[in-house]
Amino acid sequence: MSYTYLITGATSDVGRALIERLLQNAPADTLVLAQGCGDLEKLADLCARFPGQVRPFDVDLSDRAKVDTFVQVLASSAPAPTHFIHL
């Protein structure tokens, strides 16, 4: 079974450490949908280390319209999350 993690606050120190821990020994089909807000460069090293397994999204979760767009993008371009982690 493949796992898809949706992690909000993924650009935080805890978020980045969690992504690294999740993907270190994970099967290649494990996917992390990583939400940040204006600071996605913090995920660049993880995207490089785990190519194709980290998909960053720049979304301001305090803006309802942006959240709606984010949900639509996820629904059309990613598998449904099996896990949701809000940091």
State the predicted function of each range.
Residues 62-77:
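Conserved Rossmann-fold cofactor-binding substructure of NAD(P)-dependent oxidoreductases
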Residues 6, 33, 57:
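Conserved Rossmann-like nucleotide-binding pocket used by diverse enzymes
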Residues 8, 81-87:
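Rossmann-fold scaffold of SDR-type NAD(P)-dependent oxidoreductases
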Residues 23-43:
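Conserved glycine-rich Rossmann-like NAD(P)H-binding loop of the short-chain dehydrogenase/reductase
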Residues 47-65:
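Rossmann-fold cofactor-recognition segment
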Residues 11, 15-20:
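N-terminal Rossmann NAD(P)H-binding glycine-rich loop of SDR-like oxidoreductase domains
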Residues 2-4:
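Extreme N-terminal starter segment of soluble prokaryotic enzymes
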Residues 20-24, 72:
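Short, well-ordered alpha-helices that flank and scaffold nucleotide-derived cofactor binding pockets
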